[in-house]
Design a protein with these regions (language model features):
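Hydrophobic helical h-region of N-terminal Sec-dependent signal peptides
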Residues: 7-8
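Non-catalytic, solvent-exposed segments at the cell envelope interface
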Residues: 2-4, 13-359
Length: 359
């Protein structure tokens, strides 16, 4: 999954991310307490260059975050607008990708680094609460925000993350353009709230709230989307049958489309090209982890797109109207997380095929 795919696996969709226990950390833990004498240098011929990603082993859990940073607003705190988890099996031959609702009601742990005391609120806020830097109100830290979001998602799912990525809206647009766009099946007519047919942003409504002007429309059927179109399509939730849950599905489908395109070009197995793509994203992509991003991409590059299983976790609102507090997963969704943690995901989905996104 190039970058997992470029960390979207990365991604995001993104936003391909930042990490906790990575392969390097695991190796350090295995060797803790052991002292080994350094080998005596030999004048023999140099050893062959190891294959990239040779030390990357499964299973792997990757956290993929797409953030809205509102770069036009100085000091705007990043929000986790898209939160996806990719679980790669032990043999690196199958992966499951699922989304968590941005409004999922969760327990966000205390995070002293940002002065946050903890509380129960929407998942999207973990990124912004964690990004706050005491004494620097206009200088939010995306890395800090990711750390708190990662801890929150880990606590909710029971999964420990090996790597991840945070990508901004503009970064995702650049990523799609860097591979020449993606081919995608649009599963329902989608009207853009944000863009005009020519790609320009719609004007804010004079009365405040919402936008005015012509709207881009994505007709149902097979489509080729460039960067701004893919980003715009992935952002829409209003007016869709399924609302935010439909948007989650569209984001997952885009990641698979990215993966398909990257693999068709052999990108994951071209370390130099991967580095060029990542370099072009600049600070719109935040990644940290044990394995280098090129190693992660190479190790997962042999995973066929049809072995990336998209999983839709159904949810429902908690409270209504002015009493609305957020979303919660239905029991069938929570039980999938348990099955995933216990290594029973394949059988669980065989028993609950309605959770698998078909295309």
């Amino acid at each position: 999954m190039a970058l997992a795919v470029v960390t979207a696996a990365v991604v995001v969709a993104g936003g391909a991310t930042v990490a906790t226990r990575l392969v390097a950390d695991r190796q350090s833990e295995r060797g803790a307490g052991r002292i080994t004498a350094a080998p005596t240098p030999s004048p023999a011929a140099p050893s062959p260059t190891p294959t990239p990603g040779a030390d990357v082993t499964g299973p792997l859990n990757l956290l993929l975050v797409g953030v809205d940073t509102r770069v036009s607003v100085p000091g705007w705190e990043p929000h986790g607008d898209a939160v996806l988890v990719a679980h790669v099996t032990r043999g690196l031959d199958r992966a499951y990708l699922f989304s968590l609702p941005r409004d999922l009601l969760v327990d966000i742990p205390a995070y002293p680094k940002a002065g946050y005391r903890g509380g129960k609120t929407k998942l999207t806020h973990a990124m912004s609460y964690g990004s706050r830097v005491p004494g620097k109100p206009k200088q939010p830290s995306t890395t800090q925000g990711y750390e708190l979001l990662r801890s929150t998602v880990s606590g909710y799912t029971g999964l420990r993350f090996d790597a991840g990525a945070v990508v901004t809206f503009s970064g995702f647009e650049k990523l799609v353009d860097a591979v020449g766009g993606v081919d995608l099946y649009v599963d329902q007519r989608t009207v853009s709230l944000h863009r005009r047919p020519d790609g320009r942003h719609r004007d804010p409504a004079p009365s405040g709230g919402g936008y005015v002007g012509p709207q881009m429309v994505y007709a149902k059927g097979e489509r080729h989307l460039n960067g701004w179109q893919a980003l715009d399509y992935a952002r829409q939730r209003y007016g869709l049958d399924g609302g935010d849950y439909a948007r989650q599905r569209h984001q997952q489908q885009l990641i698979r489309a990215l993966m398909t395109k990257m693999q068709a070009e052999g990108l994951p197995r071209q370390p130099d090209r991967v580095e060029q793509v990542v370099g072009a994203l600049g600070d719109t992509l935040v990644y940290a982890g044990g394995p280098r991003i090129v190693d992660l991409a190479y190790a997962l590059g042999g995973l066929p797109a049809d072995r990336l299983v998209l999983v839709g976790l159904p949810g429902e609102g908690v409270g209504r109207g002015s009493a609305y507090r957020g979303e919660q997963l239905k029991p069938v969704g929570r039980q999938f997380l348990t099955a995933l943690e216990e290594g029973r995901a394949e059988q669980y989905l065989a028993d609950h095929p309605e959770l698998v996104v078909k295309r």
